[in-house]
Amino acid sequence: MRRAASLVALGLLVAAAPSRTAAPGVHVEMTWMSIANWYFQIGGLRIVMDGYITRVPEKIFVPSRQYPNDRYTFTTQPWKPNVADVRRVRDAISSDGRLDFVLAGHSHFDHTYDVATWALLTGARIIGSQSTCYQAQAQGVPASQCTVVSGSWVTGHGERIDLGHGVTLRVVRFNHSGDASNPYQHFGRELKMPPHAVNGGLRAGVAEDFPNGGGSRGYLFTVDNPGGRKLSFFVNDSASAFDLTKPVTADGLSYGSPLANLAAAMRDAGLTSVDAWIATGSAGLASMIVPVIHPKVYIPNHWDGFFNSMWRGLPFPFSDKNLSSYLSAHGIRLVPQTQYFDLYQLDAVGVSLQPNLAVKQKLGFTHAQAFAPATHAAVKAFEATVPPDDCQE
């Protein structure tokens, strides 16, 4: 019998019974906050995913001598989170500063560096890997405020969590981008204990305080919609076609392959397709995942680099000819971003891109980023020589 882990003691009710009903005319608002950072608002439910607003500078990273493709293995010094910037974003997206959950896709610095800050500023519950919870503890978040999830449906440890407001979350164990040439980044790695307090757990290297957390976690959302069909979307912040069909392993334990876990979560949700897929990766990766989830809309994320200052706005336009061609051939609508804090609205009709002008104005962003023809040309030239990867844009 497949396990739906009981998380009642940690303040989460696993949805063995039907979820509470959402208000009529329900819709999902999904705001892109750069990289793989999202703010989801579903009725009264408010969720941040990843929420990496601090920018740890590239200059402090040292690559592995043995694996030079592992460019972010070590650092020369700890780096403090930018609490003021996180607070600024919080105040712009939420009028009362309230947040219910912080989801962590995986535990690398460009995803979880600010998770503890979000939790401390808002009281939100963290959901993620054991590494994410240890990272948060090192920064002062009580262990009781963080829920460790597996997402291993094929071993009977796939979580189905009732978030309230008619929203059910299914956790899906996934892999991380890369391959055997950058094993520290790619293969599953977990912290064994909270990072040492002497540096606050703030050594950003993937072989230091921020390993990937045993691969990554994708999140499959379903939203009750009284009087209409159920809404659904799947979001993943990293993936690799290299071993998508092979089991994710960490510390000698197997968690099943990403594709098998995703297929099992889809069956558990009673879904044959999703309204939207928030994703990262190439046409090759999409060709493996699309047959499992059959998305109506593809929304890219983690394509804009992670060392650029967020406050300058989108650094370059989205461009992936091969992915665009694949999606078009399969009738999947591609809706790329035009600026940070673009807002997508999902409802019974589909997905629409909303201006979100009030939030952008609070943060100093234009409605849509303007790019010179030379920038477009440079992006296309670069695209022709380098395959897309969420850690090597």
Q: What do these predicted ranges mean?
A:
Residues 6-15:
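Bacterial N-terminal signal peptides
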Residues 16-84, 170-178, 184-212, 391-393:
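Zn-dependent metallo-beta-lactamase
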Residues 23-25, 131-218, 222-227:
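Metallo-beta-lactamase
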Residues 36, 56, 108-112, 133-136, ...:
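Active-site environment of divalent metal-dependent phosphoester hydrolases
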Residues 45-103, 108, 113, 117, ...:
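Pre-active-site segment of Zn-dependent metallo-hydrolases
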Residues 49-52, 98-108, 127-130, 232-238, ...:
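Active-site neighborhood of phospho(di)ester-bond hydrolases with catalytic His/Asp-centered motifs
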Residues 133, 137-163, 291-393:
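Binuclear metal-ion centers of metallo-dependent hydrolases, dominated by the metallo-beta-lactamase
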Residues 202-293:
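Active-site-proximal loop/helix segments of hydrolase catalytic cores
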